[in-house]
Regions:
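Residue-level signal for the short linker/turn that defines the boundary of a DNA-recognition helix
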Residues: 12, 22-23, 49-52
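DNA major-groove recognition helix of helix-turn-helix/homeodomain DNA-binding modules
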Residues: 52-67
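A short, Lys/Arg-rich alpha-helix, primarily the initiator
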Residues: 1-20
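Residues in the recognition helix of alpha-helical DNA-binding motifs
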Residues: 17, 31, 42-45, 71
Length: 92
C-alpha cells in the first residue's frame, strides 16, 4: 500500500468511527477544537492530517489512535502511532 492509499484508509477510518458514534463533523470539530471546515477538508482528503491532528481526533472520539490503523497490529501506543504517522508523512 502506498502513502496515498494509507492516508486515505486512515481518513476513511476516522470518518467511519465518527459516524458509528453518531457524532457530526461540527460536534467532533468542536470537541477537538478544530473548525468544521478544517475537519471536512481532512475527511474529504483535501487536507492531510498531521500527527497532532490524528491524535486530537482520536482523543475527541475517545478511541485508541491505533483504531485508525486496522491493518497495523504492531501499533500499540500513542507514541507508536505518532511514529507511524511521521514515517508516512516523510514519504511525501
Amino acid at each position: 500500500m502506498n502513502f496515498e492509499e494509507e492516508m486515505n484508509a486512515i481518513i476513511g477510518r476516522i470518518r467511519k468511527i465518527r459516524i458509528e458514534k453518531g457524532i457530526s463533523q461540527l460536534e467532533l470539530a468542536n470537541i477537538a477544537n478544530f473548525s468544521q471546515s478544517f475537519l471536512a477538508n481532512v475527511e474529504s482528503g483535501k487536507k492531510k492530517p498531521s500527527v497532532m491532528t490524528i491524535l486530537r481526533i482520536a482523543e475527541a472520539l475517545n478511541v485508541n489512535p491505533r483504531e485508525f490503523f486496522p491493518d497495523s497490529p504492531t501499533v500499540n501506543t500513542k507514541e507508536d502511532v505518532k511514529n507511524q504517522i511521521i514515517n508516512l508523512l516523510e514519504k511525501i
